[in-house]
Amino acid sequence: MKKAGIIMIIGSLLLLSLFKFPLWNIMLGAPQYPDPLGMNIHIDGIKGVSEFDLTNIDGLNHYIGMKVIPKPADMWEFSVFPKVIGGMAALGVLIGLLGFLEKVSYKWFIGWFILMTVLGVLGMYDFNQWLTAYGSDLDPHAIIKVVNPDGTPMSYKPPLLGYQKMLNFDVTSLPHTGGYLMFVGMSLTIVAFFVGKKETKHI
């Protein structure tokens, strides 16, 4: 299973791209902002797309009662996620190496993929919970208050994935480079599984 082991190792190593590239991106465009405001979500913190984007977003949020964008120290996820990604990358490389040496079955490759998928789903759920709290837990004394037709306060929760019109802002939430590379890496581990299965049949 040499070929399958190598593919598994490459796929696992692509997770390390998350230490350099953002996982996710949220952009806010409006007529008064010719250059959209944006924030890149990394596994260890949130950064502005441009130098002053986070400051400007926090300024807008203040008027409608939203909290400031959290610092890494404010969220436990930003200290745990790097450890999870590093651990899963190391585990994947180890499984790939053992597969290369024919010490483990190709089924370990799909086992790693399933575990990574579960962790990914949990991560997206946690991210969505944060977006909900971020957009809904508003200061009752905010300068600007917007309500729904039924009289309840309007939520400013950004979409988890895709586009949403929010007041006069066009909000887009999509994976960034690190997210796409992680997807490619996970896809390669599925390829490794089928290649390993094929190689085993030829023995």
Where are these regions (language model features)?
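Membrane-interfacial loop-to-transmembrane-helix junctions in polytopic alpha-helical membrane proteins
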Residues: K3, D74-V80, L101-W108, L167-T177
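Long, glycine/tryptophan/cysteine-rich extracytoplasmic
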Residues: K20-S79, N128-S173
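Mature, soluble, non-transmembrane domains
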Residues: F100, V104-H141, G162-Q164
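A hydrophobic membrane-anchoring alpha-helix module
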Residues: T172-E199
